[in-house]
C-alpha cells in the first residue's frame, strides 16, 4: 500500500487572475450590451415625459418646437429630443391651434433635501412671468418635500415675476425663496413651512435657468411668435 499522501492540485495565482479577468470581461460585455440595447428606449421615454410636462405647464399649447438659445443671443431649432450645442440652453416653444406662441418652457435643477430636484417651468412672454411648473424628477421625502406639487399656498406663488433687465444681462430681479409668510415682492417664492429646502430648490432651479435663458430669448421674440 502506497503510504504517500495524495495532495490536491493547486491553482496558480496567474490562472485565477486570468479566470477572474475573463469573467469580468464577459460581465462587462453583457452590461454594455444591455445599456446599448435599452438606451434608445430610455431616451424616448424621457422625451415623452418632458413633452407631456410641457403640455401640462402650457395648457394652450397644441404643438411643440424645440429650440436652443445660443451664447450669441440667437435661437435655432433642434430636432425632437435633440441636444443643445455646447454653451446653449435648450427650451420648448408651445404653439396654439393657430400656430401662435402660447408660451415657453425650460428645465431647471437645484439641490433639494435628498437629491437634485428637476423641474420644468412655463414662461409667458406677454406678462414676463413664470406661470407654472412641473416636477420632472425628484427624490424628496414623501409627505414633506412633495408638498410643492399640491400645497395651495405654494402654488399661489405663480405667476411669478421674471422680467429681463434692460441691459439683457440677466433678470431685473433675482428669483429667490423666502421664509413662509414673509413674501413681499412678486419675484419672491413663499416657502412651505416644513419643506423649506425643497421650496428653495424650486426657486433656485427657476432662477438659474431663467437667468441663463430669458435674456437670450428677448431679442428673438419675432422669430418665436409664429410657428414656422
Predicted regions and their residues:
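Flexible, solvent-exposed loop/hinge segments and secondary-structure transition points
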Residues: 2-228
Amino acid at each position: 500500500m502506497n503510504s504517500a499522501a495524495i495532495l490536491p492540485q493547486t491553482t496558480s495565482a496567474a490562472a485565477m487572475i486570468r479566470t477572474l479577468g475573463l469573467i469580468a470581461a464577459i460581465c462587462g460585455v453583457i452590461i454594455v450590451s444591455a445599456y446599448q440595447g435599452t438606451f434608445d428606449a430610455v431616451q424616448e421615454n424621457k422625451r415623452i415625459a418632458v413633452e407631456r410636462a410641457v403640455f401640462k405647464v402650457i395648457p394652450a399649447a397644441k404643438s411643440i418646437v424645440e429650440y436652443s438659445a445660443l451664447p450669441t443671443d440667437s435661437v435655432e431649432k433642434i430636432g425632437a429630443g435633440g441636444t443643445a450645442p455646447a454653451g446653449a440652453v435648450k427650451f420648448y416653444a408651445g404653439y396654439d391651434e393657430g400656430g401662435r406662441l402660447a408660451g415657453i418652457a425650460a428645465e431647471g435643477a437645484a439641490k433639494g433635501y435628498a437629491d437634485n430636484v428637476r423641474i420644468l417651468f412655463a414662461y409667458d412672454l406677454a406678462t414676463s412671468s413664470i406661470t407654472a411648473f412641473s416636477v420632472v424628477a425628484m427624490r424628496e421625502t414623501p409627505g414633506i418635500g412633495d408638498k410643492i406639487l399640491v400645497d395651495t399656498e405654494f402654488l399661489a406663488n405663480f405667476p411669478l415675476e421674471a422680467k429681463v433687465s434692460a441691459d439683457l444681462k440677466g433678470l431685473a430681479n433675482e428669483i429667490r425663496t423666502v421664509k413662509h409668510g414673509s413674501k413681499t415682492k412678486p419675484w419672491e417664492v413663499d416657502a412651505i413651512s416644513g419643506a423649506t429646502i425643497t421650496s428653495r430648490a424650486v426657486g433656485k432651479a427657476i432662477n438659474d435657468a431663467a437667468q441663463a435663458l430669458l435674456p437670450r430669448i428677448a431679442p428673438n421674440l419675432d422669430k418665436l411668435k409664429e410657428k414656422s
